[in-house]
Amino acid sequence: MKRILAIILSGVAAIWSAAPSFAQQDTSSAQQDTVRILGVGNSWTRDSMRWLSAIAASAGRPVIVGHAYLGGSTLEQQYHGIDDPSYTYKHRNIDQVVHNTYQYWKYSGTDNPVKTPAEGYKNGLAGIGVTLESVVKDEPWNIVVFQPHVIVKAHMPDYCGFDINHLVSRIKEMMEPEVAKSVRCGIMIPFSYPEGNTDYRQNVVDAYNGGIRPSIQDEWDQLYETMHCEIQKDAIKLSEHMGENCSFVINVGQAIYDTRKDRHLSGFGYKLQRAQNNTHLSEGIPMYIASLCYAYILLGITPDDISFYPRLSRDAHLTGDTGKTIQTDIVNTKSDAARARQCAWKALSLHDHQ
């Protein structure tokens, strides 16, 4: 299995090394220009882009970061809802309209958003929100990052019957011609969970030492390795299928997979995976690691360039036999942040092919 994983990772590295990036260009002028980055996906896009603007600002790179997300959706569902105001999908067992229920968050050099959904937004379930087209037209975006849906059982859904290139083309049609001509598109591979494990930690967050129980850790790690191997195959398959529409791959799943094995960092939310609702990254160090991946891949930023880090991480765990979930704020230290930056950098292996 380890040999197979190494082969697959080398394939991903080849994709990155072949793809154009800010890191491989003359950045003397790029550093003076504002880079506008838009994420399109579900709430895992929100998680992963949470700290990108603040990270870039601390490295002296002016950016505008926006993410338009539709909770619990796939890119296929978003594509169908662009031009069909009546198209719905199931979200939390409720039929939700796609067309005008996007949440749009926007950041510009700060760790707090400069634009948020309107008060009373209710996550779009009340039919309150914005269209994807309005977000695309809000800025002359330089980069658009698409986030394929990754299901808990390990795989992206087979894109048979839906071609992600259709969504890329449709979004370019919304842009001014000169913007569409120069925009760079690519994909972000999210983190996922292993399947086939009876360990209840797959469904809830616990408070064991860094989430590790040695008696079953070998089984847990083997399941993660199997699952992650499949995600790497999916990443290669999808990027090759997108062809020229995929100029980069941001493998957040790779970074989370690798750093979850760090006994120190794994204390920030179980294995860096989940916050209170057992689905999302915790807002502090875990989201920071995900945002670092964007900064490294898209902006050519290195760990030594960055001074910003979130001051708190929110850890969720169960109490006693009641199963009640409580949250505890953990104070992050400079050494925590430095460790996170190095772990994310090492996981992406950027030093091998920049």
Residue ranges and their predicted role:
Residues 46-161:
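Conserved SGNH/GDSL esterase-like catalytic core that processes O-acyl groups on lipids
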Residues 57, 172, 176, 295-303:
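Hydrophobic/aromatic-lined pockets within catalytic cores
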